[in-house]
Amino acid sequence: MSVVTLTIDGHAISAHDDQTLLQVAKEHGIEIPTLCHLDGLHDVGACRLCLLEIEGTPRLQAACTTRPQEGMVVRTTSERLERYRRTIIEFLASEGNHHCAVCVANGHCELQDLALRTGLEYVRVPYLYPSRQLDASHPDFVMDHNRCVLCTRCVRVCDEVEGAHTWDIANRGIACTIIAGLNQPWGNVDSCTACGKCVAVCPTGALFPK
């Protein structure tokens, strides 16, 4: 581990090279939007909302998985980044059934907060209106796949903190979904300890108590 000096949004900053740019930015009060990141869990770079511009690199890089390097020049905000983040929120909103007025997470939803923060006033792309399962088989909790944004927080907190390994990811692309056990009803999965950690970390109304 060594100390490097880099520039973030015009500020010269020292950081350890085993940190992520997201950690470095947070330490210095620079806010970067995220959806899949959660302190204490390993980062997967799934939501792509924390993308940054790095001078000399044509591709945008995820702050949660990129390490600082000596002399690196980073921009966390620009017209290009704001447009990109707003488009991601648009796609997330259109791919699921996110009807805020009737959602249990209305008023405390991270997706809703990000839409407001990025200035998203309306969704320009067609809504898919998918018909997804609502799993109410668990005695204490409900999983509404219509509002899942595939951040995988539930999967990671169940694996890394609780050690129950109840949740997993199945399929790819638009068919990708979170499954319990071997694609069973949640209430039938013996590994679930009913701890509620997955519900606590869900950023939307996909997981909620009965």
Over which residues does each language-model region extend?
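ABC nucleotide-binding domain "signature motif"
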Residues: L6, L52, L207
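Extended, non-catalytic structural segments that build the interaction scaffolds
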Residues: D9-H11, M143-D144
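Eukaryote-biased recognition of intrinsically disordered, low-complexity regulatory segments
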Residues: M1-D9
